[in-house]
């Protein structure tokens, strides 16, 4: 034991050697953290039926993120019996390949939304967003009444699609060119409802 301590003592007394050994250990730890991410990025393919968001749903996802919905709602069903019985099959990475930023979340004040699409009607979703306590008296969710009058900007949606295409999402020129027409006359409320209704489908 005393012999082993001499090596530690020698390293501790030599600041240059200690610094080099620290850099080596940090580099090894960094490789252990980063390498799987680089491999996984190429290995995770979209699940069957998973496509990039259309223009209206993409605008809705942006509203969802901007309004901080992810702070109270997750979109990740864990592989626990209680969760799969309540929400359905557990979430897998291939369902979220087009989510930037990802929406898995880390906290639930409200229910998980990964499979909410189609569970309620569009009218229910609209009312719930405008006046949550009208449909769920015990809800502590805030009302989002301003979304009903906020019009979407088709040029912003098209620019977002171009950016996502640069990041690897398979948007075509016709998708991008048609974005303005797809959201013409639509509100942020319409977009958020469309986004929610598509989750899990």
Summary of predicted features, one role per range:
Residues 60, 66-75, 125, 192-196:
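The canonical Cys-X-X-Cys-His
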Residues 30-38, 74-76, 81-86, 140-141:
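Short, solvent-exposed loop/turn and secondary-structure capping segments
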Residues 18-28, 85-189:
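Electron-transfer interface patches adjacent to heme c in soluble/periplasmic c-type cytochromes
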